[in-house]
Protein backbone atom coordinates (compact mmCIF):
# COMPACT_ATOMS: atom_id res chain seq x y z
CA UNK A 1 0.00 0.00 0.00
CA UNK A 2 1.40 3.38 -1.08
CA UNK A 3 0.36 6.38 1.06
CA UNK A 4 1.25 9.96 0.11
CA UNK A 5 2.28 12.10 3.08
CA UNK A 6 3.53 15.65 3.41
CA UNK A 7 5.57 17.65 5.91
CA UNK A 8 2.31 18.89 7.50
CA UNK A 9 -1.50 18.77 7.26
CA UNK A 10 -1.70 15.01 6.66
CA UNK A 11 -4.93 13.02 6.82
CA UNK A 12 -5.25 11.71 10.42
CA UNK A 13 -6.74 8.47 9.05
CA UNK A 14 -3.58 7.80 7.02
CA UNK A 15 -1.39 8.39 10.07
CA UNK A 16 -3.62 6.20 12.24
CA UNK A 17 -3.42 3.38 9.68
CA UNK A 18 0.39 3.52 9.66
CA UNK A 19 0.54 3.47 13.46
CA UNK A 20 -1.89 0.52 13.54
CA UNK A 21 0.31 -1.45 11.13
CA UNK A 22 3.38 -0.78 13.29
CA UNK A 23 1.56 -1.78 16.48
CA UNK A 24 0.56 -5.05 14.80
CA UNK A 25 4.21 -5.83 13.99
CA UNK A 26 4.11 -4.63 10.39
CA UNK A 27 6.89 -3.09 8.31
CA UNK A 28 6.88 0.34 6.66
CA UNK A 29 9.13 2.18 4.21
CA UNK A 30 9.39 5.92 4.80
CA UNK A 31 11.38 9.07 3.95
CA UNK A 32 13.90 10.60 6.34
CA UNK A 33 16.18 13.63 6.20
CA UNK A 34 18.82 11.45 4.50
CA UNK A 35 17.53 8.43 2.55
CA UNK A 36 14.41 6.28 2.37
CA UNK A 37 14.45 3.63 5.10
CA UNK A 38 12.58 0.51 6.15
CA UNK A 39 11.51 -0.03 9.72
CA UNK A 40 9.15 -1.42 12.34
CA UNK A 41 8.08 -0.95 15.95
CA UNK A 42 11.41 -1.24 17.79
CA UNK A 43 9.88 -2.97 20.82
CA UNK A 44 8.23 -5.76 18.79
CA UNK A 45 10.93 -8.43 18.68
CA UNK A 46 9.37 -10.49 15.88
CA UNK A 47 9.10 -7.40 13.69
CA UNK A 48 12.76 -6.58 14.40
CA UNK A 49 13.73 -10.14 13.42
CA UNK A 50 11.74 -9.72 10.19
CA UNK A 51 13.73 -6.58 9.31
CA UNK A 52 17.01 -8.39 10.03
CA UNK A 53 16.01 -11.24 7.71
CA UNK A 54 15.05 -8.75 5.00
CA UNK A 55 18.46 -7.04 5.19
CA UNK A 56 20.29 -10.35 5.62
CA UNK A 57 22.00 -9.13 8.79
CA UNK A 58 22.88 -10.88 12.03
CA UNK A 59 21.80 -8.63 14.93
CA UNK A 60 24.61 -10.09 17.04
CA UNK A 61 27.18 -8.65 14.61
CA UNK A 62 25.53 -5.54 13.16
CA UNK A 63 24.52 -2.34 14.91
CA UNK A 64 20.80 -1.66 14.94
CA UNK A 65 19.38 1.87 15.02
CA UNK A 66 16.14 3.38 16.23
CA UNK A 67 14.30 6.62 15.44
CA UNK A 68 12.94 8.59 18.40
CA UNK A 69 10.58 11.56 18.29
CA UNK A 70 12.90 13.56 20.53
CA UNK A 71 15.39 13.05 23.37
CA UNK A 72 12.86 13.15 26.23
CA UNK A 73 12.76 9.35 26.76
CA UNK A 74 16.23 8.55 25.46
CA UNK A 75 17.42 7.11 28.79
CA UNK A 76 14.91 4.26 28.44
CA UNK A 77 16.57 3.01 25.28
CA UNK A 78 20.23 4.02 25.69
CA UNK A 79 22.75 4.98 28.35
CA UNK A 80 23.80 8.58 27.86
CA UNK A 81 26.00 10.83 30.01
CA UNK A 82 25.51 14.58 30.41
CA UNK A 83 28.14 15.63 27.85
CA UNK A 84 26.79 13.25 25.21
CA UNK A 85 23.22 14.41 25.87
CA UNK A 86 24.27 18.04 25.40
CA UNK A 87 26.06 17.13 22.15
CA UNK A 88 22.97 15.35 20.86
CA UNK A 89 20.71 18.22 21.89
CA UNK A 90 22.86 20.67 19.90
CA UNK A 91 22.71 18.54 16.75
CA UNK A 92 19.25 16.96 16.77
CA UNK A 93 16.91 16.83 14.98
CA UNK A 94 19.43 16.25 12.23
CA UNK A 95 21.18 13.83 9.88
CA UNK A 96 23.09 11.94 12.57
CA UNK A 97 23.18 8.46 14.08
CA UNK A 98 24.60 8.49 17.60
CA UNK A 99 25.94 5.10 18.74
CA UNK A 100 25.27 4.57 22.46
CA UNK A 101 25.24 1.67 24.92
CA UNK A 102 21.82 0.01 25.06
CA UNK A 103 19.29 0.82 27.75
CA UNK A 104 16.86 -1.36 29.68
CA UNK A 105 13.66 -1.16 27.58
CA UNK A 106 15.00 -2.53 24.30
CA UNK A 107 14.25 -6.15 23.35
CA UNK A 108 16.82 -8.88 23.97
CA UNK A 109 17.80 -8.86 20.29
CA UNK A 110 19.40 -5.42 20.87
CA UNK A 111 21.12 -6.33 24.12
CA UNK A 112 23.17 -9.04 22.42
CA UNK A 113 25.07 -6.23 20.66
CA UNK A 114 25.24 -3.88 23.68
CA UNK A 115 25.10 -0.85 21.36
CA UNK A 116 22.27 0.96 19.60
CA UNK A 117 22.15 3.79 17.09
CA UNK A 118 19.87 6.71 17.97
CA UNK A 119 18.32 8.91 15.26
CA UNK A 120 16.07 11.96 15.57
CA UNK A 121 15.69 12.90 11.89
CA UNK A 122 14.93 16.42 10.76
CA UNK A 123 11.87 15.12 8.92
CA UNK A 124 8.35 15.89 10.12
CA UNK A 125 6.62 12.79 8.68
CA UNK A 126 8.55 10.03 10.43
CA UNK A 127 8.83 12.02 13.67
CA UNK A 128 5.05 12.56 13.72
CA UNK A 129 4.55 8.82 13.26
CA UNK A 130 6.97 8.17 16.14
CA UNK A 131 5.10 10.60 18.34
CA UNK A 132 1.73 8.98 17.60
CA UNK A 133 3.18 5.49 18.08
CA UNK A 134 4.68 6.57 21.43
CA UNK A 135 7.61 4.23 20.80
CA UNK A 136 10.82 4.19 18.78
CA UNK A 137 11.00 2.79 15.25
CA UNK A 138 13.76 0.41 14.23
CA UNK A 139 15.34 1.91 11.12
CA UNK A 140 17.69 0.73 8.38
CA UNK A 141 18.36 2.04 4.88
CA UNK A 142 16.98 0.28 1.82
CA UNK A 143 19.49 -2.06 0.14
CA UNK A 144 20.79 -1.23 -3.33
CA UNK A 145 22.53 -3.85 -5.43
CA UNK A 146 25.81 -2.91 -7.10
CA UNK A 147 24.52 -2.42 -10.66
CA UNK A 148 21.08 -1.15 -9.73
CA UNK A 149 19.87 2.36 -10.56
CA UNK A 150 19.82 4.72 -7.56
CA UNK A 151 16.18 5.54 -8.40
CA UNK A 152 15.15 2.21 -6.82
CA UNK A 153 15.88 3.67 -3.38
CA UNK A 154 14.90 7.31 -4.07
CA UNK A 155 11.70 7.22 -6.18
CA UNK A 156 8.56 6.07 -4.31
CA UNK A 157 6.96 4.32 -7.31
CA UNK A 158 10.13 2.32 -8.01
CA UNK A 159 10.60 1.61 -4.31
CA UNK A 160 7.06 0.18 -4.30
CA UNK A 161 7.85 -1.88 -7.40
CA UNK A 162 10.95 -3.41 -5.82
CA UNK A 163 10.04 -3.67 -2.13
CA UNK A 164 6.24 -3.81 -2.18
CA UNK A 165 6.30 -7.48 -1.23
CA UNK A 166 8.38 -6.80 1.87
CA UNK A 167 6.61 -3.77 3.34
CA UNK A 168 3.02 -3.44 4.50
CA UNK A 169 2.99 0.31 3.81
CA UNK A 170 5.24 2.52 1.69
CA UNK A 171 5.08 6.22 2.47
CA UNK A 172 5.48 8.47 -0.56
CA UNK A 173 7.25 11.57 0.68
CA UNK A 174 8.62 12.62 -2.70
CA UNK A 175 12.07 11.94 -4.14
CA UNK A 176 14.50 10.80 -1.44
CA UNK A 177 18.14 11.63 -0.83
CA UNK A 178 21.23 9.53 -1.48
CA UNK A 179 23.58 10.64 1.30
CA UNK A 180 23.55 8.65 4.58
CA UNK A 181 23.61 10.04 8.09
CA UNK A 182 26.82 10.94 9.90
CA UNK A 183 27.61 8.23 12.47
CA UNK A 184 28.99 9.39 15.83
CA UNK A 185 30.23 6.78 18.32
CA UNK A 186 29.70 7.90 21.92
CA UNK A 187 30.07 4.53 23.69
CA UNK A 188 33.46 5.42 25.20
CA UNK A 189 32.45 8.88 26.41
CA UNK A 190 34.41 10.89 23.84
CA UNK A 191 32.47 11.45 20.61
CA UNK A 192 34.14 9.96 17.51
CA UNK A 193 32.88 10.38 13.95
CA UNK A 194 33.10 6.93 12.35
CA UNK A 195 31.31 7.89 9.12
CA UNK A 196 30.99 11.38 7.72
CA UNK A 197 27.64 11.71 6.00
CA UNK A 198 25.13 14.47 5.45
CA UNK A 199 25.31 15.93 8.95
CA UNK A 200 28.15 18.20 10.11
CA UNK A 201 28.65 17.86 13.85
CA UNK A 202 28.52 20.97 16.00
CA UNK A 203 30.75 20.19 18.97
Where in this protein do the model-derived segments appear?
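Active-site-adjacent structural elements in enzyme catalytic cores
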Residues: 1-203
Amino acid sequence: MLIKLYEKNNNPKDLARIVEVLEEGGIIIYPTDTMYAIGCHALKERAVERICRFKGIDPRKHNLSIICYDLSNISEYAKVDNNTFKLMKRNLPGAFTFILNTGSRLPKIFKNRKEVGIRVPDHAVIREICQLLDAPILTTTLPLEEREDIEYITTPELIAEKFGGEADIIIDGGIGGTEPSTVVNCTEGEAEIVRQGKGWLEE
